């Protein structure tokens, strides 16, 4: 029994070391192209374009979000549709129409300016900065169900567990908590003084440690302005106060210059389900790591039961 206990302890140490060294995967969408983002260096490397749906380019992507199965989803603003994104090459598969035609800006081809995120109960949430509405979305076919009006210009969504947060922008530099029953947004706090430029949209994602990362997009600029920063900014948001801390510009290839990044997703925390011991396995870990974690938990439980019997 002592030998088994030593094995379990050694395995847990190895698991901890491997998890600590596991790379946190982050992605961003810029119009029609997926980029892999290095959070430490705030740099972007092109993965690939979304491609075409028939003869139509799949573009104006936003609301990049991981499902509970670690699949990437995004909204296709140019088609008013839901898509699934292949993280290996950036290609998009159209899943269905959102059914929201006629609710967007008539001066911009019915643009709704959409944000999206999954919560830990598997619900897919969708928000429109233009229409000021919150919907749920069927991940299988894109069908939407109206929840209610947010009452504010919400440009991005993110969930921590089943708690929904929204970020303003466009002269509403405020971080909000959103009621999932009514859609109403309640202010948590201001972004603070760090964002010195007009923000068009804020894309957000929590990492496995609970840090809220954000991408600040400045394209298109404020009405009447022609000045556009070359790069979107990587930032962090204090969930308790709403204050933004800018990490730095997300520098990438020339093709990314002055192209706003409107979708952003960090490899998601594992949502805890069911009873028993929860093991956090960061995204990007090799498949055997989760199996090892489960095996070690089972062995540890068997060891403890053996001691109790004796």
Positions of predicted regions on the chain:
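Short, threonine-centered small-residue motifs that mark membrane-proximal processing/anchoring sites
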Residues: 18-23, 267-292
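An edge-strand/N-cap motif at the start of beta-rich repeat modules
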Residues: 20-48
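Conserved beta-propeller blade signature
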Residues: 25-29, 71-75, 123-126, 164-167, ...
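Short loop/turn segments that connect beta-strands within beta-propeller blades
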Residues: 38-42, 86-90, 138-142, 179-183, ...
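Beta-propeller fold detector
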Residues: 44-52, 93-100, 145-150, 185-192, ...
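Repeated scaffold domains used in trafficking and secretory/extracellular systems
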Residues: 55-65, 103-117, 152-161, 196-206, ...
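Blade-level signature of beta-propeller repeat domains, shared across WD40, Kelch, NHL, RCC1
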Residues: 229-233, 239-274
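A cross-kingdom C-terminal cell-surface attachment/processing module
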Residues: 287-306
């Amino acid at each position: 029994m002592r030998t088994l206990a030593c094995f379990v302890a050694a395995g847990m140490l190895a698991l901890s070391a491997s998890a600590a060294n596991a790379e946190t995967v982050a992605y961003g969408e810029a119009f029609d192209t997926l980029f892999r983002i290095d959070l430490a260096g705030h740099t972007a490397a092109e993965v690939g374009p979304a491609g075409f749906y028939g003869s139509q380019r799949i573009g104006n992507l936003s609301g990049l979000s991981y499902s509970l199965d670690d699949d990437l989803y995004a909204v296709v603003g140019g088609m008013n549709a839901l898509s699934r994104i292949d993280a290996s090459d950036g290609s998009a598969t159209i899943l269905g129409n959102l059914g929201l035609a006629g609710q967007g800006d008539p001066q911009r081809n019915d643009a709704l300016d959409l944000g999206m995120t999954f919560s830990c109960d598997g619900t897919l949430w969708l928000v429109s900065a233009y229409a000021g509405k919150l919907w749920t979305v069927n991940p299988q076919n894109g069908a939407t169900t109206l929840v209610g009006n947010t009452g504010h210009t919400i440009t991005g969504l993110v969930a921590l567990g089943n708690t929904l947060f929204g970020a303003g922008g466009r002269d509403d530099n405020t971080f909000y908590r959103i009621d999932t029953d009514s859609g109403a947004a309640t202010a948590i706090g201001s972004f603070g003084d760090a964002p010195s430029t007009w923000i068009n949209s804020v894309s957000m994602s929590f990492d496995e440690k609970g840090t809220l990362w954000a991408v600040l997009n400045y394209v298109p600029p404020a009405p009447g302005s022609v000045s556009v920063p070359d790069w979107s900014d990587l930032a962090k948001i204090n969930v308790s106060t709403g204050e933004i801390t800018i990490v730095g510009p997300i520098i990438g290839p020339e093709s990314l210059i002055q192209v706003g990044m409107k979708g952003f997703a960090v490899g998601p925390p594992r949502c805890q389900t069911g009873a028993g011991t929860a093991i956090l396995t960061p995204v990007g870990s090799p498949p055997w790591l989760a199996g090892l974690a489960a095996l070690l938990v089972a062995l540890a439980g068997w060891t403890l039961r053996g001691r109790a019997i004796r």
